[in-house]
Structure formats: structure tokens, C-alpha cells
Amino acid sequence: MKVLVINAGSSSIKYQLLDMSTGNDLASGIVERIGEEMGSISYKTGEKYTAEQPFPTHREGMVEVINLLTDADKGVVKDKAEIAAIGHRIVHGGELFFEPVEIDDKVLQGIRDCIPLAPLHNPGHVIGIETAMELFPGVRQVAVFDTSFHQTMEPKAYMYGVPYKYYEDWGLRRYGAHGTSHKYVARETAKLLGKPLEESNIITVHLGNGASISAVKNGKCYDTSMGLTPLGGIIMGTRCGDIDPAIVGFIAERTKQSAAEVVATLTNESGLKGICGSNDLRDIHARIEEGDEKAKLALDMACHKVRQFIGAYAFELGRVDAIVFTAGIGENDEIYRENCLSGLENFGITINKEKNENWDRTPSFISEDDGAVKVAIIATNEELEIANDTVKVLGL
């Protein structure tokens, strides 16, 4: 059985076709710059294929994905009818969706209703679903929400100290993000520990250009760093993370910008990029080696904020079995990991330098063998998690 996983953005479509009998990735890629004069598509099986061509809308992009998947030479299926189901990554489900759900007209409208909570993401998801429904008539489709995993938080963790009617009228609360990734690596970490997930306390650290941290207590999300939107929490590539709320008004008053314009700056021009001009850690590390103080400040600030959240969550959980790093930075940047956890030996948190610098991409611990708190690196696999949820929801 084959399941197609789609993550449609405002101008892109990430896709992956999985063989559910093995869990293997048969083909994957991305369509980018949809709606621009010239777009691009990548397609990877054993080899990688790339091409540039215009994609006026998501429909043209999806058609080309189907063409590649069924191509006589490069394809991995003879006909699109071999695709049994489609799973869609959805960033925000608000309080409407507590778990993955089969898509119908009501669900699609619910995703539209959550657009104010994820204006950069949910509109693209809606277009992706509508396009897939058109091109795959009769194929059952499932929405898997980044926010679902965090719905087990208690009100004391997800409510804000603002008038309660804002929650009643608009659903203003903490929702979190990257839930599919946090869920996947928490389960895989419990396997490493040799403990049932339901008995494991784990701090999951998802570090990519977007980043978040979750406290997982007895297998369920107890708290998470991102808030109403994916802008809150730790310092990210281009996003500010948690700041004094009055900063928005402070900037707006001095720049004569609207609140929306200030939020756009905090989303796209802040974080690491705002401090040192770059959100590429490779560039930042190189500049630090050359003595660049702003690059060092950016890295120090980001790691400082990660340490703050880990410390807070350790106290909230009471007992921490493991801390796990995942996603692009978490999996690939040994300096970042070391900076986040160095000097915490008194709390039972250690890093073995050799293990940290020579991780072989298999799920494993990088802490000292006698460390009270295990530190792991696990490559996230959100696509496989979405595909598994899709199969489970549809009973396939």
C-alpha cells in the first residue's frame, strides 16, 4: 500500500510517497515558487532530478508531481490509482481538531476557519487539499495537525494572562507547533530508553529554521514553547520567539508601521537573522571563527533561550528521563547542541564530545554512559508519522 504525504505552502508543495509495507520513502521532492514567473521542481528516488518551469497555480505543480511519479523512466508507480490514500500536514487546527481526521467539506471549512491562527500556512494547506481532491477523485484524504499533540496541555499551561473573554471569543491561547515531530521523536526516544512511552518523561527539542521545545510527561504533551502562532518560544532563524508584548507597540509607534507589518518583521527579519544578518548556521559558525561578535551573540542568545526552556521544563516534569534533539539544526549542528547543554553536569545532563561530533544518523544517545539524564539525537520523520496516522484513521 502506498500513501502520498503532502505539505502545501502558499507557494510550494512538499511531497513524499511511502510504501507502508516497509515504511520506505519511494520518492520525494518539492515544487517551489508557485505563481512566480519561473518555478522549480525536485524529485528524488535513487537519483535526484530537478527542473525549472512555470507553475502558475498549485494545480500545475501537483500535475507535474503525478507525471514524475508515473513516468516510464523515473516513476515509482505505473498509475496514480496505486496511491491508496493521501495525508496532509496542517500547521494549525485550533481547538477544532484534537486528532488526525478524514477530510470532508466540514473539515476543510474548519481548516479555513483556523487561517487567522496560521495565516502563513493554512491558506496553502487549503489550496493543496482542494487540488489533491480534484486530481485524485475518490482517494480518501486525511488532515494531520501540528497542534494535535499539544491538546493534552492543561489550561494552566495553555492559557495567557489576558482577559478570559479573548479565549472565549477568539480562541486566544497557546497551541504549539511541530507536534507531529515531537510525537514521533518522543516515541522513538522511549524505545531507546527501553521504557513504555506512557512511563517516560522526555524533553523534545525540535531545532530547525522554525524551532520549538516540548515537555512530554508520561507520553503526553505537558507544555510547549510555541504559542498562539509559530512565532513564540525560542529564538529561531528569522523569528523573534518570546518577547515583551509591548515591543510591538513600541516599534509601531516609531516606524509608523501597522501591527501586521511589525509582526511580519518579527517573523521574517528577526531571530538569528535580525541579530547578525544571517539565519544560516554554517555562515554563522564561519563568522564566529573569524571573530564576528554579532554572529557569536546570535548563537549565544539562541542557545541561552533553549537552556532556559529545558531548565523550566525539567522543573515542571520533576523527573527527566531524556532530552532529545531533532530536525535540521538539532540533527546536524554539534556545536549548537553542545552550547545548549554544556556545564549542566550537576543536573545529571552530560554530553560525550566524541559521540556528539560523530553521530551516525541512527537513533542513539550522545550523553555519557553514567549520565542520569540521557541525551539523544533522533532524525525526525514527520512524513512517516503522517502516513501512519493516515492509515490508522482510514482503517487501511
Curated annotation (Swiss-Prot):
What are the record keywords, sorted?
ATP-binding, Cytoplasm, Kinase, Magnesium, Metal-binding, Nucleotide-binding, Transferase
Which positions bind Mg(2+)?
A: 7, 382
* Entry annotation: catalytic residues: 146 (proton donor/acceptor)
| Cofactor details (free text) | Mg(2+). Can also accept Mn(2+).
Q: Where does ATP bind?
A: 14, 206-210, 280-282, 328-332
Q: Name one GO biological process term.
A: acetyl-CoA biosynthetic process
Binding of substrate: at which residues?
89
Q: Which top EC class is given?
A: transferase
Q: Which GO terms describe its cellular component?
A: cytoplasm
What SUPFAM superfamilies does the annotation carry?
Actin-like ATPase domain
List residue numbers at the site (Transition state stabilizer): 178, 239
PROSITE patterns in alphabetical order: ACETATE_KINASE_1, ACETATE_KINASE_2
Pathway field of the UniProt record reads: Metabolic intermediate biosynthesis; acetyl-CoA biosynthesis; acetyl-CoA from acetate: step 1/2
Summarize the protein's role: Catalyzes the formation of acetyl phosphate from acetate and ATP. Can also catalyze the reverse reaction.
**Subunit architecture:** Homodimer.
* Name the record gives this protein: Acetate kinase
Q: Which organism is it from?
A: Maridesulfovibrio salexigens (strain ATCC 14822 / DSM 2638 / NCIMB 8403 / VKM B-1763) (Desulfovibrio salexigens)
List the lineage, top down: Bacteria, Pseudomonadati, Thermodesulfobacteriota, Desulfovibrionia, Desulfovibrionales
